[in-house]
């Protein structure tokens, strides 16, 4: 009898151990915005941004793709600027192409972060408050509409995630070559993880960004909001000029697939880029005048120091300004439509450096 009891106790212990292991390996449901995605399922909903005096509020559509096994939480955000269409369309596709049953971890998708700008087709700024959403993070609960959108994204998405990709393209007036920003002002381990994520995304031109704020309360930019909270962050650019071209959309899809493979959230995906072009010193070139812009340089063009990038005229055609590159480098984007206001960007130039170790001289 004693032997039988011992065997039974041993069997019960084994069963409990196996149940414990299975529980440790099981994915949990994910709930946010009033919807729940069980393991191995997809769920979609909307965050509500309540109205305040001066605006009607808005909604932020999102999807949860919850895998069957535990793993990272990757947040993908599109539509921070409303006329940046390829990121929005790429995430529409990814919502249905990512199979949650073959996924480890969770993918959180923000389909259109800036719905007011998207519906009103406004570049740069929100139509109700004139603010650039990607300059007001982490946001304010009692602020203007852009502030409140940023606060919801910070609280509901960024703070839930382990990795964040803010997916952009050139705005409706911008023509650009694909590239990404790698922020190095975060903690060394976070910066290294973010670098590996940039390589995994696969865009071969990577700007080494050394000027982002380090305070979580003054993070300003969406991806930097993740980094100041100890999470890997990345900003990528693919497409522009209000276009919906297949190449720009597919490039984003491939990039996300590469990151999912890198994070071991999926078994398959593209290899990381191995021959990156690292870009160090950079400058956004701006107009000193309001008038008409005539771009001369093109995205992807290598230019010498002093090369002509653009001209600005008044509304009668009289030349007001010639804008030149301050150094030899590569043109990453130009504003490609005629309207230009004083102080607005006309182009972005960056200088090639030897590798990711580059830092500005102090």
Model-assigned labels for residue ranges:
Residues 2-5, 24-362:
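Structured catalytic-domain cores with a bias toward divalent-metal coordination
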Residues 10-20:
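Bacterial N-terminal signal peptides
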């Amino acid at each position: 009898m004693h032997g039988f009891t011992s065997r039974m106790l041993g069997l019960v212990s084994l069963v409990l151990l196996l149940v414990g292991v299975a529980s440790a390996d099981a994915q949990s449901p994910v709930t946010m915005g009033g919807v729940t995605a069980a393991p191995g399922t997809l769920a979609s909903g909307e965050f509500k941004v309540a109205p305040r005096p001066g605006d009607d509020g808005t909604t932020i559509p999102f999807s949860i793709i919850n895998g069957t096994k535990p793993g990272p939480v990757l947040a993908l955000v599109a539509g921070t600027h409303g006329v940046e269409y390829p990121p929005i369309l790429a995430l529409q596709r990814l919502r249905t192409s990512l199979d949650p049953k073959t996924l480890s971890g969770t993918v959180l998708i923000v389909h259109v972060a800036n719905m007011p700008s998207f519906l009103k087709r406004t570049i740069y700024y929100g139509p109700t408050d004139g603010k650039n959403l990607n300059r007001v993070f982490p946001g304010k609960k009692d602020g203007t509409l852009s502030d409140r959108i940023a606060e919801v994204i910070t609280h509901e998405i960024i703070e839930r995630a382990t990795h964040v990709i803010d997916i952009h393209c050139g705005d409706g007036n911008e023509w650009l070559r694909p590239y990404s920003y790698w922020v190095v002002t975060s903690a060394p381990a976070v910066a290294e993880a973010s670098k590996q994520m940039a390589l995994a995304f696969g865009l071969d031109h990577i700007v080494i960004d050394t000027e982002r704020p380090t305070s979580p309360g003054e993070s300003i930019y969406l991806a930097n909001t993740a980094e100041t909270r100890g999470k890997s962050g990345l900003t990528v650019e693919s497409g522009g000029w209000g276009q919906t071209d297949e190449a720009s959309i597919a490039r984003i899809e491939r990039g996300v697939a590469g990151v999912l493979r890198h994070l071991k959230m999926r078994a398959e995906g593209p290899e990381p880029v191995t021959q990156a072009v690292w870009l160090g010193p950079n400058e956004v070139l701006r107009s000193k005048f309001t008038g008409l812009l005539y771009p001369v340089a093109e995205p992807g063009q290598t230019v010498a120091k002093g090369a002509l990038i653009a001209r600005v005229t008044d509304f009668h055609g009289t030349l007001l300004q010639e804008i030149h590159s301050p150094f030899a480098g590569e043109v990453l984007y130009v504003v490609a439509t005629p309207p230009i206001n004083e102080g607005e960007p006309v182009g972005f130039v960056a200088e090639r450096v030897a590798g990711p170790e580059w830092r500005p001289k102090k």
